[in-house]
Swiss-Prot record:
Region spans: Interaction with ZNF296: 416-513
Domain comment in the entry: The 9aaTAD motif is a transactivation domain present in a large number of yeast and animal transcription factors.
C2H2-type ZnF: 430-454, 460-484, 490-512
Residue ranges, annotated region (Disordered): 22-45
Protein name stated in the entry: Krueppel-like factor 4
Region (Interaction with target DNA): 473-504
InterPro entries linked: Znf_C2H2_sf, Znf_C2H2_type
Numbered residues of crosslink Glycyl lysine isopeptide (Lys-Gly) (interchain with G-Cter in ubiquitin): K32
Length: 513
């Protein structure tokens, strides 16, 4: 005997919830028989258990997708058999096709799995609690949630019911810790569908590029996990069912069977893209190709040239190879031999310091290349030239000299010529003939000034007003005149004092020492 519809049944009918008899693929009598037998006869439940897409709606049995999701939750909770309501009349076939064309199944599925409307959640929670208390279910009672939230029991394909205990043994996602499912479950299916976002979240899920995953290495039994880590972006709202647990699930293998797949839910807001950062080995870029880099301070010695001997060069000014190559007249350099190792030249003793060794870049050339040398005392770099006429390269801008075909031969150093290259001492030819003096001078003017000391002649007079001083030498008058003007040209470098005479400054500097 049917009872009159209650408030919960009216609310379900107002929300366009169909009868659960429409979910079966056969008539009502066959559906009742299959439900009593406990066989999984609902295709919608099977697709949810495998986390696959929803199949097309059966002809003649249209229903609302959101209502179907809520009804599946009620049946899994154990209240599906007792919940009654008004059945929706089937629509004609043409209207069914038009209705199915207007439905976006991917969008509805993703939104229904993420967060259902509060009104429908409250209605279904109240009806589920009332129905579960009135009539028992064939699969066993399940604890209804106290709050208006959903717990989606996603079970394996061959798990018809829930385990006794209230939370369900086959649950994959939930607030309470659930034991592993009884049936083997491959996470390759979850790799296609996000735990909480559906197919829409699949489009927003960032995956790591296989290029940036380290290569597979053989692992001992139980030695750890190496494989592909896929970061699942969880788009659930705060406080929802799938936003709280942070679980990393591991499958037995990837779709190709080479390595396991690890799925980690990400609850940190919108999905982020992983920056593709590739680390490469640091390579030294030199102008000489494969040879070692040359610095200004240390430079390898020269090897034997096939056309001549080594080239000596002085240490200063030390000019780097980069400066040589950056000059205007530089030639393209050739790569060094692969087996090159710098060592001091054989023609130089080992006791010389490194700075005294010849500073010529090591190069081996077989062929008819022209070698050229700079002037003695300047750094020389011999570079090959592929033309018929060679050119000498001396940094930065020394004159070029053409050499006959031959080898790089060092030139003999030539002595420099200058004004004071040889010592010249003037002889004192001017001697004072005054009795008892005997002084000699190199200049006649000095001797003439000296004779004034003997004769007492003072031809230099001070013309300052009121001053009648006379002097035998002009430099003495100049120093005297500074007393009237106050001019002190000799400044002390240690302090702020200045003097009018240089000898006075020399005496003053002895105090600082």
């Amino acid at each position: 005997m049917r009872q009159p519809p209650g408030e919960s049944d009216m609310a379900v009918s107002d929300a366009l919830l169909p009868s659960f008899s429409t979910f079966a693929s056969g008539p009502a009598g066959r559906e009742k028989t299959l439900r009593q037998a406990g066989a999984p006869n609902n295709r919608w439940r099977e697709e949810l258990s495998h986390m696959k897409r929803l199949p097309p709606v059966l002809p003649g049995r249209p229903y609302d997708l959101a209502a179907a999701t809520v009804a599946t939750d009620l049946e899994s909770g154990g209240a599906g058999a007792a919940c009654g309501g008004s059945n929706l009349a089937p629509l004609p076939r043409r209207e069914t096709e038009e209705f199915n064309d207007l439905l976006d199944l991917d969008f509805i599925l993703s939104n229904s799995l993420t967060h259902p409307p509060e009104s429908v959640a409250a209605t279904v929670s109240s009806s589920a609690s009332a129905s579960s208390s009135s009539s028992p279910s064939s699969s066993g009672p399940a604890s209804a949630p106290s709050t208006c939230s959903f717990t989606y029991p996603i079970r394996a394909g061959n798990d018809p019911g829930v385990a006794p205990g209230g939370t369900g043994g086959g649950l994959l996602y939930g607030r309470e810790s659930a034991p592993p499912p009884t049936a083997p479950f491959n996470l390759a299916d979850i790799n296609d569908v996000s735990p909480s976002g559906g197919f829409v979240a699949e489009l927003l899920r960032p995956e790591l590029d296989p290029v940036y995953i380290p290569p597979q290495q053989p692992q001992p039994p139980g030695g750890g996990l190496m494989g592909k880590f896929v970061l699942k972006a969880s788009l659930s709202a705060p406080g929802s069912e799938y936003g709280s647990p942070s679980v990393i699930s591991v499958s037995k293998g990837s779709p190709d069977g080479s390595h396991p797949v690890v799925v980690a839910p990400y609850n940190g807001g919108p999905p982020r893209t992983c920056p593709k950062i590739k680390q490469e080995a640091v390579s030294s870029c030199t102008h000489l190709g494969a040879g070692p880099p040359l610095s200004n301070g240390h430079r390898p010695a020269a090897h034997d040239f096939p056309l001549g001997r080594q080239l000596p060069s002085r240490t200063t000014p030390t000019l780097g190879l980069e400066e040589v190559l950056s000059s205007r007249d530089c030639h393209p350099a050739l790569p060094l031999p692969p087996g090159f190792h710098p060592h001091p030249g054989p023609n130089y003793p080992s006791f010389l310091p490194d700075q005294m060794q010849p500073q010529v870049p090591p190069l081996h050339y077989q062929g008819q290349s022209r070698g050229f040398v700079a002037r003695a005392g300047e750094p020389c770099v011999c570079w090959p030239h592929f033309g018929t006429h060679g050119m000498m390269l001396t940094p930065p801008s020394s004159p070029l000299e053409l050499m006959p075909p031959g080898s790089c031969m060092p030139e003999e150093p030539k002595p420099k010529r200058g004004r004071r290259s040889w010592p010249r001492k003037r002889t004192a030819t001017h001697t004072c003939d005054y009795a008892g003096c005997g002084k000699t001078y190199t200049k006649s003017s000095h001797l003439k000034a000296h004779l004034r000391t003997h004769t007492g002649e003072k031809p230099y007079h001070c013309d300052w007003d009121g001053c009648g001083w006379k002097f035998a030498r002009s430099d003495e008058l100049t120093r005297h005149y500074r007393k009237h003007t106050g001019h002190r040209p000799f400044q002390c470098q240690k302090c702020d004092r200045a003097f009018s005479r240089s000898d006075h400054l020399a005496l003053h500097m002895k105090r600082h020492f």
